[in-house]
Amino acid sequence: MLASIFNFTGQGFKPMEKVYTQVSHKIAVKNIKAMFKASSQTQINAGMAWYQNAQDQAQAIAIKHDMPVYIVVAVIAALSPNNKWARNLQNADDLIAGFIAGDAMETIKVSTYHKMKAKAWSILQDIPDYDTAKTMLNGQKITSFFMDIMGEFNVTIDGHARNIAYNERVGLTDDRTNIGVREYRALQEAYYDAARDLDLMPYQLQAITWTAWRELHGIV
Protein backbone atom coordinates (compact mmCIF):
# COMPACT_ATOMS: atom_id res chain seq x y z
CA MET A 1 0.00 0.00 0.00
CA LEU A 2 2.72 2.45 0.95
CA ALA A 3 4.54 1.78 -2.30
CA SER A 4 1.70 3.39 -4.20
CA ILE A 5 1.81 6.50 -2.04
CA PHE A 6 5.47 7.03 -1.21
CA ASN A 7 8.83 6.75 -2.89
CA PHE A 8 11.45 5.09 -0.70
CA THR A 9 14.91 6.60 -0.65
CA GLY A 10 17.94 5.67 1.37
CA GLN A 11 17.10 8.56 3.68
CA GLY A 12 13.47 7.63 4.28
CA PHE A 13 10.09 8.08 2.67
CA LYS A 14 9.01 11.05 0.63
CA PRO A 15 5.70 11.76 -1.14
CA MET A 16 5.61 10.83 -4.83
CA GLU A 17 5.56 13.69 -7.30
CA LYS A 18 2.09 14.18 -8.75
CA VAL A 19 2.02 13.84 -12.52
CA TYR A 20 -0.64 15.71 -14.48
CA THR A 21 0.67 14.91 -17.96
CA GLN A 22 0.59 11.66 -19.92
CA VAL A 23 4.40 11.54 -20.05
CA SER A 24 6.96 12.55 -17.43
CA HIS A 25 8.35 16.07 -17.29
CA LYS A 26 11.74 14.78 -18.44
CA ILE A 27 10.27 13.07 -21.51
CA ALA A 28 8.14 16.10 -22.39
CA VAL A 29 11.23 18.33 -22.28
CA LYS A 30 13.12 15.80 -24.41
CA ASN A 31 10.31 15.69 -26.99
CA ILE A 32 10.11 19.48 -27.23
CA LYS A 33 13.88 19.81 -27.67
CA ALA A 34 13.87 17.04 -30.28
CA MET A 35 11.26 18.92 -32.32
CA PHE A 36 13.38 22.06 -32.08
CA LYS A 37 16.50 20.20 -33.22
CA ALA A 38 14.55 18.79 -36.18
CA SER A 39 13.50 22.31 -37.25
CA SER A 40 15.04 23.86 -40.34
CA GLN A 41 16.73 27.25 -40.20
CA THR A 42 13.79 28.70 -42.13
CA GLN A 43 11.39 27.35 -39.51
CA ILE A 44 13.56 28.69 -36.70
CA ASN A 45 13.68 32.13 -38.30
CA ALA A 46 9.90 32.15 -38.79
CA GLY A 47 9.26 31.08 -35.21
CA MET A 48 11.69 33.59 -33.76
CA ALA A 49 9.96 36.39 -35.65
CA TRP A 50 6.32 35.43 -35.08
CA TYR A 51 5.56 37.10 -31.76
CA GLN A 52 7.70 40.14 -32.49
CA ASN A 53 5.78 40.58 -35.73
CA ALA A 54 2.54 40.19 -33.78
CA GLN A 55 3.59 42.93 -31.36
CA ASP A 56 4.60 45.16 -34.28
CA GLN A 57 1.18 44.65 -35.87
CA ALA A 58 -0.53 45.46 -32.58
CA GLN A 59 1.67 48.55 -32.26
CA ALA A 60 0.51 49.73 -35.69
CA ILE A 61 -3.14 49.41 -34.62
CA ALA A 62 -2.34 51.20 -31.35
CA ILE A 63 -0.73 54.13 -33.19
CA LYS A 64 -3.61 54.29 -35.67
CA HIS A 65 -6.19 54.61 -32.88
CA ASP A 66 -4.05 56.39 -30.24
CA MET A 67 -4.50 53.44 -27.91
CA PRO A 68 -2.02 51.80 -25.48
CA VAL A 69 -0.45 48.81 -27.17
CA TYR A 70 -1.26 46.45 -24.28
CA ILE A 71 -4.95 47.36 -24.64
CA VAL A 72 -4.80 46.50 -28.33
CA VAL A 73 -3.05 43.22 -27.51
CA ALA A 74 -5.72 42.44 -24.91
CA VAL A 75 -8.44 43.05 -27.52
CA ILE A 76 -6.58 40.85 -30.00
CA ALA A 77 -6.25 38.10 -27.39
CA ALA A 78 -9.92 38.32 -26.42
CA LEU A 79 -10.96 37.95 -30.06
CA SER A 80 -8.52 35.12 -30.82
CA PRO A 81 -10.50 31.93 -30.04
CA ASN A 82 -11.28 30.01 -33.24
CA ASN A 83 -10.07 32.98 -35.28
CA LYS A 84 -7.45 33.04 -38.05
CA TRP A 85 -4.60 35.45 -37.30
CA ALA A 86 -5.15 37.90 -40.18
CA ARG A 87 -8.87 38.01 -39.42
CA ASN A 88 -8.13 38.33 -35.70
CA LEU A 89 -6.12 41.49 -36.39
CA GLN A 90 -8.81 42.91 -38.67
CA ASN A 91 -11.51 42.17 -36.09
CA ALA A 92 -9.50 43.99 -33.40
CA ASP A 93 -8.96 46.98 -35.69
CA ASP A 94 -12.65 47.10 -36.61
CA LEU A 95 -13.85 46.76 -33.01
CA ILE A 96 -11.54 49.52 -31.76
CA ALA A 97 -12.52 51.80 -34.65
CA GLY A 98 -16.21 51.16 -33.98
CA PHE A 99 -15.80 51.78 -30.26
CA ILE A 100 -14.04 55.10 -30.87
CA ALA A 101 -16.69 56.12 -33.42
CA GLY A 102 -19.46 55.45 -30.90
CA ASP A 103 -20.96 52.51 -32.77
CA ALA A 104 -23.00 49.90 -30.91
CA MET A 105 -21.08 46.72 -30.18
CA GLU A 106 -23.77 44.63 -31.88
CA THR A 107 -23.19 46.36 -35.22
CA ILE A 108 -19.54 45.28 -35.43
CA LYS A 109 -18.91 41.82 -36.86
CA VAL A 110 -16.16 39.59 -35.50
CA SER A 111 -15.26 35.98 -36.26
CA THR A 112 -15.34 34.64 -32.71
CA TYR A 113 -17.85 34.10 -29.93
CA HIS A 114 -20.15 36.90 -28.79
CA LYS A 115 -18.93 36.61 -25.19
CA MET A 116 -15.37 37.18 -26.40
CA LYS A 117 -16.43 40.28 -28.29
CA ALA A 118 -18.17 41.50 -25.12
CA LYS A 119 -14.97 40.88 -23.15
CA ALA A 120 -12.91 42.89 -25.65
CA TRP A 121 -15.52 45.66 -25.55
CA SER A 122 -15.35 45.80 -21.74
CA ILE A 123 -11.58 46.24 -21.94
CA LEU A 124 -12.06 49.16 -24.34
CA GLN A 125 -14.65 50.70 -22.03
CA ASP A 126 -12.49 50.44 -18.91
CA ILE A 127 -8.98 50.98 -20.36
CA PRO A 128 -7.57 49.10 -17.34
CA ASP A 129 -3.93 49.04 -16.30
CA TYR A 130 -1.69 46.24 -17.59
CA ASP A 131 -2.27 43.72 -14.81
CA THR A 132 -6.01 44.38 -14.68
CA ALA A 133 -6.24 43.85 -18.44
CA LYS A 134 -4.75 40.38 -17.92
CA THR A 135 -7.24 39.70 -15.13
CA MET A 136 -10.15 40.81 -17.30
CA LEU A 137 -9.15 38.37 -20.03
CA ASN A 138 -9.75 35.58 -17.50
CA GLY A 139 -8.92 32.57 -19.63
CA GLN A 140 -5.71 30.54 -19.51
CA LYS A 141 -5.09 30.45 -23.28
CA ILE A 142 -6.07 34.03 -24.10
CA THR A 143 -4.25 35.45 -21.08
CA SER A 144 -1.21 33.41 -22.08
CA PHE A 145 -1.47 34.65 -25.67
CA PHE A 146 -1.54 38.24 -24.38
CA MET A 147 1.59 37.59 -22.31
CA ASP A 148 3.42 36.04 -25.26
CA ILE A 149 2.72 38.97 -27.58
CA MET A 150 3.82 41.37 -24.85
CA GLY A 151 7.12 39.49 -24.50
CA GLU A 152 6.75 37.97 -21.04
CA PHE A 153 8.53 34.74 -20.05
CA ASN A 154 5.57 32.58 -20.96
CA VAL A 155 4.21 30.04 -23.41
CA THR A 156 0.73 29.33 -24.76
CA ILE A 157 -0.23 25.67 -24.81
CA ASP A 158 -2.53 24.77 -27.68
CA GLY A 159 -3.29 21.36 -29.14
CA HIS A 160 -0.15 21.40 -31.30
CA ALA A 161 2.07 22.36 -28.34
CA ARG A 162 0.50 19.52 -26.39
CA ASN A 163 1.13 17.06 -29.23
CA ILE A 164 4.76 18.14 -29.52
CA ALA A 165 5.37 17.58 -25.80
CA TYR A 166 3.79 14.12 -25.99
CA ASN A 167 5.19 13.30 -29.45
CA GLU A 168 1.69 12.25 -30.40
CA ARG A 169 -0.51 13.52 -33.20
CA VAL A 170 -4.05 14.02 -31.93
CA GLY A 171 -6.64 16.04 -33.86
CA LEU A 172 -7.60 19.37 -32.34
CA THR A 173 -11.23 18.25 -32.07
CA ASP A 174 -10.18 15.30 -29.88
CA ASP A 175 -11.18 15.62 -26.22
CA ARG A 176 -7.56 15.01 -25.23
CA THR A 177 -6.67 18.48 -26.50
CA ASN A 178 -9.05 20.03 -23.96
CA ILE A 179 -6.26 20.79 -21.53
CA GLY A 180 -7.12 21.29 -17.86
CA VAL A 181 -5.43 23.83 -15.60
CA ARG A 182 -2.98 21.39 -13.97
CA GLU A 183 -1.97 19.76 -17.25
CA TYR A 184 -1.62 23.22 -18.83
CA ARG A 185 0.73 24.40 -16.07
CA ALA A 186 2.75 21.18 -16.23
CA LEU A 187 3.18 21.50 -19.99
CA GLN A 188 4.20 25.13 -19.58
CA GLU A 189 6.91 24.03 -17.14
CA ALA A 190 8.21 21.55 -19.72
CA TYR A 191 8.47 24.32 -22.32
CA TYR A 192 10.09 26.64 -19.76
CA ASP A 193 12.82 24.13 -18.97
CA ALA A 194 13.39 23.26 -22.63
CA ALA A 195 13.60 26.97 -23.48
CA ARG A 196 16.14 27.61 -20.72
CA ASP A 197 18.28 24.75 -22.02
CA LEU A 198 18.12 26.20 -25.55
CA ASP A 199 18.60 29.84 -24.45
CA LEU A 200 15.25 30.90 -25.90
CA MET A 201 12.12 32.56 -24.61
CA PRO A 202 9.40 29.92 -24.13
CA TYR A 203 7.06 31.57 -26.62
CA GLN A 204 9.86 31.57 -29.22
CA LEU A 205 10.42 27.85 -28.70
CA GLN A 206 6.68 27.19 -28.99
CA ALA A 207 6.43 29.20 -32.21
CA ILE A 208 9.42 27.41 -33.76
CA THR A 209 8.25 23.92 -32.86
CA TRP A 210 4.63 24.79 -33.78
CA THR A 211 5.82 25.82 -37.26
CA ALA A 212 7.97 22.71 -37.69
CA TRP A 213 5.27 20.35 -36.39
CA ARG A 214 2.59 21.72 -38.69
CA GLU A 215 4.85 21.54 -41.73
CA LEU A 216 5.98 18.02 -40.81
CA HIS A 217 2.38 16.83 -40.68
CA GLY A 218 1.04 18.94 -43.54
CA ILE A 219 -1.29 20.94 -41.30
CA VAL A 220 -2.60 24.08 -43.00
Predicted regions and their residues:
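HhH-family (HhH-GPD) DNA N-glycosylase catalytic core used in base-excision repair
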Residues: 2-220
